[in-house]
Amino acid sequence: MANTNTKKKSAALSGQEIPTLNIKAENIIFISDIHFGWASSSEEWQENQERYFNEWFIPYIQKTLAERPETVVVSLGDVYHDRKSIDIDVNELCIDTFERIANIIPCYIINGNHDLSKKTNKGNSSLRSLTNIKNLTVIKEPTLMKFKSGTKVLASIAAIPYLGDCNDENKWLVEFSGKAEYALMHTDISKMKFDNGMTIVGAVDAEKFSGRVISGHIHKRQETPKVVYVGSPYQMSRGDIGNQKGIYLLTLEDGELIFTPNNFSPVFQKLDIKQFMNMTDVERREKLNGNYTDIVIDEADVPNYKMADIYELMNTSGAKRAQLEVKKSKIDVSDDEDGRSTDEKTVEELIDQAIESLEGVDEQTIAELKALSSQYLSAAREAEDQK
């Protein structure tokens, strides 16, 4: 099993010492954005998360250790969801879960923004409740992790927790560039996508780092040659529809990043009413059982169906939650320049269109307005999904 010892290394950036962790391990399992306490700490979501860890993630760890003994787990932030208060049952679930994990494998956690009381890493952290767990290390400041096999250094990895300032995070990327092959972060990264699909601008610049960046924070899993957003381990809202969740394993000897899909946890999905009604009982239960499903019906088609029949089929499907979504009929709409009518565009596209039509505004301001709009809509969606 991997083990760790700590020493200090001087840092040109801070004038202080950069913590350095020497870790005997050849592989890293990445998980991120667990968000214990999601959906207002509902019992339903506590059950979802408990089952995920007990029935999928921990068995995955055990299987991996059987094949690759020198492996550790790294969580890339947002272990908890609520910055202000944590439900007692949620806290117990989190502690119990990480005690189980750390009992079988070394575990490292970097601060995410939801783990902090303030919007920087200067405040208190909810991760303090995990610091007394044996075999678990919480990383609260930029740290160099050196992974070794015997005396051979397989990889040097920079761990940069959420700092609350992309300028500071950029400086640390520059500091670690050339000294580490990977940077582990929890942040917004320019040119990647927010969960709502909007492009991130004015954030951390991954090009300042010579290696590859692996980050938490954005829930939608994304990969480019330069950046990997690990994403949340399971779908958490409608914004995750179509985004395959799972776990990454990095093999340090050859730099291979292996993705294992999570086909265990509930998913969010939308079904057209005709598709839903034409399914057999067996097909319907297979599709909806344990999942969150919106059944979409056009407003004009409502009179063609008996609502009682639809609700009866939904209620007997075994779904975690199934609800009817009435889609407004299209009325007197005009086509835009791209050939799509206004009601065919997303809210984000319509706002972008309005921003781009502003007169006397430079490109940088337009980009910043789009970024602010995107962040607001992401927060609004998250709040809506937790109702």
Language-model region placement:
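Accessory, non-catalytic peripheral segments of nucleic-acid enzymes
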Residues: A2-K24, A66-E67, L252-K387
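Core catalytic region of metal-dependent phosphoesterases/phosphodiesterases
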Residues: G15, N22, E26-N27, S41-L144
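Active-site neighborhood of phospho(di)ester-bond hydrolases with catalytic His/Asp-centered motifs
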Residues: F30-S32, V72-D78, P106-N113, T137-P142, ...
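Active-site environment of divalent metal-dependent phosphoester hydrolases
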Residues: H35-A39, H81-K84, I110-N124, M145, ...
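Short, conserved loop/helix-junction motifs that constitute active-site signature segments
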Residues: E99-N103, V174-S177, A203-F209, G242, ...
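Conserved catalytic scaffold of divalent metal-dependent phosphoesterases
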Residues: D115-V204, P233
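Active-site regions of enzymes building and remodeling cell-envelope glycoconjugates
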Residues: N135-L136, E181-A183, P225-G231, Y311-A322
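Conserved beta-sheet core of the metallophosphoesterase superfamily
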Residues: D195-T260
